[in-house]
């Protein structure tokens, strides 16, 4: 019972504090999502986890020995190893003024003792570069900003090798009649109260949780009061900051405050708070009152910047606002100067002051209706792309994958004009929020698992010029209004139950059509088979027919690429040059038409299973076409001679390059990433772009070939299997594949699926990263995945990466690639990603590496120009 009462008391306390902090958002970044909100004991502020406001990042904690000097909200942090841009989304009040604070306490959370730097963005605009070098106690960035919508995005952007992170996010709603500026935001420069002290003032003394630091120079004189000071003006500076003031020392007549700027051209906004702490009594006669009234002028950078003289109010605050357009050489000064004509004897004073630099954010956010629509689409289809964060269209280098936008000028909001969600395994109906993208010109939803009908609203989207709904499970009739649209290209093949014209056939009223169609089809198939059998019997010797009874299944269409054995002899110059050898047979170099280089794979006569694999590869390669799959030029099927003719891949296979068989040439990290993503694209096509889908079943580095430009193409389809509509996407089989690359799940189920290819690709990716053998013979055939998993727990990535790369890589992209590879080789097939996800993740790795290369190039150019 006592515990229950204590719990209820805690809940009521939280509610009380939250109600007192209306308009506050206080996020403890990295605090585990299962941790409840808590009251920070020093300030009484209620902090909660940030997990509901960002889809990415990993929780970290500063080192134990550093925790004592920080308050609780700064002990945890969230760091971002994935993606270039990671964004918080916060619900705010549109067109209301907020103070936004971002806190960064590194605390050597990663053990590297390497202080990071990165960029911080507000929506599509850069706010500030965060550089923590030398800032042992952390850093705080603060800005006063008016959101243009009811959703605010705060993004951390990777700029180099270090990982962005954040400790806390704090938003405070301000009065709209304070800090009023035109078309700019105010970046915090300093906020001081003038007293000899070491105490920071913040909430609850300051109702807006502004943090005031003490400042005092030895040559000044301090005055204080124990009387109450009225702080009731628009700004409400805390009373604790108003009960002291600085005045000139040694009977001086002017008080000088100096500060410096990194950029001398920055515009400065000053807010100076005054209160008279030595009031003249009410009963004092007029002459003495005049003598002891404090009157002075405001002089900035040597010029009077405030037309009227300033007379502080007795024990009450008044605030003077002024703008400084430029500080020569970055040296700024504010002087409070007693007027020589003033009859008063008192010198100037200042109680507190705030200084800001003006930032003009050039880019307008993407049209808010488009943003709402694309986020509803993202949520409906559960699209978890790491780059689908922040503003969809801006900055352009962070444009969401699959989108294109129109850009007029920086002051006009971009519009989404193209949406490509092909091959994303979308399920359910076509989401109606697509129609709210009113400027959409291109819509691609092909190669998914969408159901339901084609919606009428597509016909009403006047901007649409192209719609691709191919290869889904859509049903019913296409709206006539959509078919009647001129200047609209509509693709919808691969939807068996979707009708192009008129009402679809049903079980009633269309029985005659239902019966006639299959009968006619059966007759046509029978005649075709009969013709094939007759031709086959006439042309083939009986011995060959007995050896290969299913050869008649090769279609007549395939014969268009048929090459005779004599042509094979001619193109290979009687099999002069061997370029490879495998279980299928020998591969020879050759020339087609005396000009085009080709690779000729000849079936060994001793191969008992050769013809089945030969047939599979011919039929597969003749119907798949992808830039990252090796193209079949032709084939030979002549009596006892079987051969496949491929495009020639001048740079051999990936394994030979990794093993050093090509001399001293080491594949750079950017080249390895390109090879990985190109291989992944080939596999993605087999799994998602082919109907029916295909499983390669023998993905390995030796089957990844490189052309003269080092473009990767997947080869050796002899073991591949395709799956018809309605057939389960797995195959029960005898022993296939290559030891080390073969899915361990196969030894339990004797089945191979798309996730088996994913596993094999993960092994290849580990080879690419580490350049280690898949099976280590000197260590009882210990597997590469097991070795890397152990190394990840004991050391950093530099000991895992191929030493031949000599550190020339972006550590973030390597870390991301390693994480991806380990997810691909997860023992549970369900936990492995699909190839579409693999492609997207590898593209992010390439972006990170390209950013490193561009940064390095710019540094070289800068050094040469200087």
Curated annotation (Swiss-Prot):
LRR repeats lie at residues 415-438, 439-461, 463-485. It is an enzyme of class 2 (transferase). It is a single-pass type I membrane protein. It is found in: Membrane. It comes from Arabidopsis thaliana. ATP binds at residues 579-587, 601. The chain crosses the membrane at residues 516-536. Belongs to the protein kinase superfamily. Ser/Thr protein kinase family. GO terms for cellular component: membrane. This is Probable LRR receptor-like serine/threonine-protein kinase At5g16900. The modification Phosphotyrosine is found at residues 646, 746. Glycans are attached at residues 137, 176, 230, 251, 331, 404, 409, 436, 468, 505. The active site is at 698 (proton acceptor). The modification Phosphoserine is found at residue 732. The modification Phosphothreonine is found at residues 564, 733, 738.
């Amino acid at each position: 019972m006592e515990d229950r009462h204590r719990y209820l008391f805690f809940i009521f306390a939280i509610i009380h504090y939250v109600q007192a902090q209306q308009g506050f958002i206080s996020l403890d970044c990295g605090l585990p999502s299962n941790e409840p909100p808590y009251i920070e004991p020093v300030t009484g502020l209620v902090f909660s986890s940030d997990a509901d406001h960002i889809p990415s990042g990993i929780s970290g904690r500063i080192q134990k020995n550093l925790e004592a000097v920080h308050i609780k909200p700064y002990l945890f942090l969230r760091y971002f190893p994935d993606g270039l841009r990671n964004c918080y989304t916060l619900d705010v009040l549109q067109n209301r003024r907020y103070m936004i604070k971002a806190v960064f306490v590194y605390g050597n959370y990663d053990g590297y003792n390497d202080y990071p730097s990165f960029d911080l963005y507000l929506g599509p605009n850069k706010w500030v570069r965060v550089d923590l070098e030398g800032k042992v106690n952390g850093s705080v960035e603060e800005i006063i900003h008016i959101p243009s919508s009811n959703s605010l995005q705060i993004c951390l952007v990777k700029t180099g090798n270090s990982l962005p992170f954040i400790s806390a996010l704090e938003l405070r709603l301000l009065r709209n009649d304070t800090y009023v500026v035109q078309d700019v935001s105010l970046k915090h420069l300093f906020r001081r109260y003038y007293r000899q002290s070491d105490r920071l003032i913040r909430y609850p003394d300051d109702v807006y949780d502004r943090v005031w630091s003490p400042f005092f120079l030895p040559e000044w004189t301090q005055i204080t009061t124990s009387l109450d000071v009225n702080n009731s003006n628009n700004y409400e500076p805390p009373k604790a900051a108003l009960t002291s003031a600085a005045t000139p020392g040694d009977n001086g007549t002017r008080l000088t405050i100096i500060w410096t700027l990194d950029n001398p051209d920055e515009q400065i906004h000053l807010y100076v708070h005054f209160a008279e702490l030595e009031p003249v009594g009410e009963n004092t006669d007029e002459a003495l009152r005049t003598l002891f009234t404090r009157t002075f002028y405001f002089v900035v950078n040597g010029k009077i910047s405030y037309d009227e003289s300033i007379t502080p109010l007795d024990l009450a605050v008044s605030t003077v606002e002024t703008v400084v357009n430029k500080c020569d050489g970055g040296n700024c000064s504010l002087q409070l100067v007693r007027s020589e004509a003033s009859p008063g004897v008192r010198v100037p004073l200042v109680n507190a002051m705030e200084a800001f630099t003006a930032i003009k954010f050039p880019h307008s956010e993407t049209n808010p209706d488009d943003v709402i629509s694309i986020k509803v689409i993202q949520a409906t289809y559960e699209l978890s792309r790491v780059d689908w964060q922040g503003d969809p269209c801006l900055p352009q280098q962070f444009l969401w994958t699959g989108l294109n936008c129109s850009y007029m000028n920086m002051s006009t909001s971009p519009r989404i004009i193209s949406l490509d969600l092909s091959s994303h395994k979308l399920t359910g109906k076509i989401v109606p929020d697509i129609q709210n993208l009113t400027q959409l010109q291109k819509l691609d939803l092909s190669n998914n698992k969408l159901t339901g009908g084609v919606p009428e609203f597509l016909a009403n989207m006047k901007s649409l010029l192209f719609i691709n709904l191919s290869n889904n499970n859509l049903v019913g009739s296409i709206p006539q209004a959509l078919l009647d649209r001129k200047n609209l290209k509509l693709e919808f093949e691969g939807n068996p139950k979707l009708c192009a014209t008129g009402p679809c056939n049903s079980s009633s009223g269309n029985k005659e059509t239902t019966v006639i169609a299959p009968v006619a089809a059966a007759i046509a198939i029978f005649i075709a088979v009969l013709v094939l059998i007759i031709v086959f019997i006439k042309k083939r010797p009986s011995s060959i027919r007995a050896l290969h009874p299913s050869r008649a299944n090769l279609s007549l269409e395939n014969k268009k690429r048929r090459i005779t054995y004599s042509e094979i002899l001619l193109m290979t110059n009687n099999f002069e040059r061997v370029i490879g050898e495998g279980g299928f047979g020998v591969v020879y170099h050759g020339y087609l038409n005396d000009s085009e280089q080709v690779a000729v794979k000849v079936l060994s006569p001793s191969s008992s299973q050769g013809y089945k694999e030969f047939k599979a590869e011919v039929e597969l390669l003749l119907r798949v076409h992808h830039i990252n799959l090796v193209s079949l030029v032709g084939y030979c099927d002549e009596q006892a001679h079987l051969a496949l003719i491929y495009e020639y891949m001048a740079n051999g296979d990936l394994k030979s390059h990794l093993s050093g068989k090509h001399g001293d040439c080491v594949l750079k990290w950017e080249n390895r990433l390109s090879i990985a993503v190109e291989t992944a694209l080939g596999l993605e096509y087999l799994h998602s772009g082919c109907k029916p889908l295909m499983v390669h079943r023998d993905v390995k580095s030796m089957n990844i070939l490189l052309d003269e430009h080092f473009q990767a193409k997947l080869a050796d389809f002899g073991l591949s299997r395709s799956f018809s509509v309605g057939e389960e996407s797995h195959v029960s089989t005898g022993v296939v594949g290559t030891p080390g690359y073969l899915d361990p799940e196969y030894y339990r189920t004797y089945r191979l699926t798309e996730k088996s290819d994913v596993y094999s690709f993960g092994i290849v990716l580990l080879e690419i990263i580490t350049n280690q053998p898949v099976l280590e013979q000197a260590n009882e055939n210990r597997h590469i995945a097991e070795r890397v998993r152990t190394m990840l727990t004991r050391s950093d990535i530099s000991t895992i990466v191929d030493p031949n790369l000599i550190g020339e890589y972006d550590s973030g992209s390597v870390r991301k690639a390693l994480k991806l590879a380990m997810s691909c080789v997860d023992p549970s097939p369900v936990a492995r990603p699909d190839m579409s996800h693999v492609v997207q993740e590898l593209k992010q790795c390439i972006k990170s590496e390209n950013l490193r290369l561009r940064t390095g190039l710019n540094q070289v150019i800068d050094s040469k120009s200087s």
